Design a protein with these regions (language model features):
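N-terminal Rossmann-like FAD-binding beta1-loop-alpha1 element of flavoenzymes
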Residues: 1-4
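Flavin (FAD/FMN)-binding glycine-rich loop and adjacent Rossmann-like elements that form
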Residues: 14-16, 38, 42, 61, ...
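N-terminal glycine-rich phosphate/pyrophosphate-binding loop and immediately adjacent elements
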Residues: 87-94, 115, 132-135
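Conserved N-terminal/central alpha/beta ligand/cofactor-binding core
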Residues: 7-103, 107, 148, 157-158, ...
């Protein structure tokens, strides 16, 4: 049985209540899907009852010809949250909303379960395997798994609507055009537009999160208070901090930018690079686990990666891939009665490959040299 503990009141985390409802490319920038399996399944689910901003070559799925258009798209975070709930309930997953995980209960390095705080008070939920999908390794850290804090720039946005956008939406019959993003800080992931002299936010403790939220919200108020009224309005602020690289584990393996085009025997899947065409990485299983912690595993933004490797691994498509791998690994660990770090890698790879995941990239996809058009930053990604 599976119990999903959700601290918010909707599913999806940063991709939904966090308003980062944007798929970076799943493709190599040449017309080929690289990130497959559950990532493709959830991409289709997110667009089933939603607007999209797919380029023409990707409107009907993977094109039958080479293209430099990339497969990125915005989607409705609200509808995706609802669709995720329907999917999980249909699969028999038990979901507990508004359940704040306070602490893991440890016996040495073995997790007996977690304590949650909710409207009915404090409760204990036992577990055989625990997957930390918090995005900031909060459970892993409290359990004693070594972690590294990340840095985040002055970036924060909400969602609003304008009458001008509504007119365009009516004319083009496209509701997406009605929306706009009001910003607090507007720095990008490389630190461009970071205010001079302002240091990045380090980690994700309570003080840092409050500093980040309050500074950004006040900056947004300064920017928007003279604009909002009868013709323009902010209708949603993010429900969680929009911290991309808050904290990650120091796992049995660490993905870095130097791993580009390197094969890995313990790969759980091939991923692409949202800022560069062609670049490929095989994700080692070890980025999700740490020896000695026999029933703890993580995924998504808190997987073990550093430098550019962390940026490549943290975004939605690779996060889905590592989440899929973590779930399968948890089931294998229980079925095989082995520590989570020691699951048979061949069985894990086969289970992933059976869903379409590309475990090892084809060497023919590797260019002999960096192409002139290799840099292809996703236009809407921050």
């Amino acid at each position: 049985s599976v119990l999903l503990l959700e601290g918010q009141c909707v599913l999806g985390g940063l991709a939904t209540s966090g308003l980062v409802n944007y798929w970076v490319p799943l493709c190599n920038g040449r017309g080929k899907y690289i990130i497959r399996g559950m990532a493709q399944e959830l991409l289709r689910l997110s667009l089933a009852h939603s607007f999209n901003t797919l380029y023409p070559d990707w409107k009907q799925g993977e094109p039958d010809h080479e293209t430099t258009q990339r497969s990125d798209t915005w989607f409705s975070g609200g509808m995706f949250s609802l669709a995720l709930l329907k999917l999980l309930k249909d699969e028999g997953v038990e979901i507990l909303y508004n359940a704040l995980v306070s602490a893991p209960v440890m016996e040495g390095k073995h997790c007996k379960g977690v304590i949650i705080d909710g409207k009915s008070g404090r409760r204990f939920y036992p577990c055989r395997v625990l997957v930390d999908a918090s995005g900031d390794a909060s459970i892993m850290k409290q359990a004693g798994v070594p972690v590294t804090d990340g840095t985040n720039y002055f970036t924060y946005y909400g969602e609003g609507i304008t009458l001008g956008g509504c007119r365009a939406a009516v004319e083009k019959k496209n509701i997406f055009l009605a929306y706009y993003h009001p910003y607090g800080g507007a720095a990008n992931l490389h630190g461009q537009f970071q205010p001079e002299g302002k240091p990045p936010y380090m980690g994700c403790d309570m003080e840092t999160i409050n500093q980040y939220l309050q500074e950004n919200q006040l900056r947004m108020y300064e920017k928007e208070s003279g604009n909002c009224g009868m013709e323009q309005n902010i209708h949603t602020l993010p429900g969680i901090p929009q911290l991309r690289t808050a904290r990650r584990i120091r796992g049995n393996a660490t993905l870095t930018g130097e791993d580009c085009y390197r094969h890995c025997d313990t790969s759980i899947g091939t991923i692409c690079d949202f800022e560069f065409r062609d670049r490929l990485y095989e994700v080692p299983y070890g980025v999700l686990v740490k020896d000695g912690f026999d029933n703890l595993i993580t995924c998504g933004r808190s997987a073990s990666a550093s430098g550019w490797g962390w940026d490549v691994l943290r975004v939605i498509p690779p996060a889905v891939l590592t989440g899929q791998a973590a779930g399968i690994a948890a089931a294998l660990a229980i079925a095989q009665d082995v520590p989570i770090a020691d699951v048979p890698i061949e069985k894990l790879q086969k289970a992933l490959a059976d869903t379409g995941v590309i475990i090892h990239f084809d060497d023919s996809w590797v260019p002999r040299e960096e192409a002139d058009d290799g840099h292809a930053a996703s236009k809407d990604h921050i």
